[in-house]
Amino acid sequence: MEGTAVLGGLGARLRLPWREATIRAIREETPSAKTLVLDVPGWPGHAAGQHVDIRLTAEDGYQAQRSYSIASAPGSGELELTVELIDDGEVSPYLTEDALPGDGFELRGPIGGYFVWEPRLPDPLLLVGGGSGVVPLMAMLRHRRATGSTVDARLLLSARTIEDVLYREELEGLAAGSVDVRITLTRGEPPPGWDGFARRIDREMLAEMGPPPAEGPRAYVCGPTPFVEEAARLLVELGHEPARVHTERFGPTGD
């Protein structure tokens, strides 16, 4: 999740302490997105699908706060956030364009108990992401791989262009293994030899991805609010139980 989340549990959130996070390393994922590897003393650990709040404080005391999904798998020994640049944002421009290893900021978390996946869950896994909504879904896939889970896992990712696809090489590796990965591009012409989809996510696409509702899959949908609402609606229309369609949405600020 990248932006202001539409989430509950405000009371529990406010009880979490702010911690000092230091950037240990930075990786470029796309021309507009970077992954920050953080050192956070006292970090209690997290579950796949959770997120954190980040707070920046300017020299004049002005503070800006945004929420970002955790990209790293639980138990990996890393805390990683992938941040996509929002041109008119207050936080993402600093994190993607100005921040350097050794810089620090305040961090609060982990947050969230609804949009999480654990290897003990035996149900097939259907992941649907829009843009940077793939970040918490990647944490789930990384956790699945690290724990040796053999749960049926499928990922459908929507991106504007192939250059906007986060974790592209890693996704190709997962697709060559035990994860069914399909990408749909929504803008411009797809590259030569493209074997994915080239349209917005629709009912036919979701039905093709499966697993069928009769198998009782757990679906996790993350992305901008309109994307999530439409994908969740289509999944329910296809017969998926609403209680098994977990959603995480970006808020209106989009930063």
What are these regions (language model features)?
Residues G8, L14-P17, D152-D255:
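Reductase modules of NAD(P)H-dependent flavoproteins
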Residues P110-L121:
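A short, basic/flexible loop-to-alpha-helix module at the beginning of a structural domain
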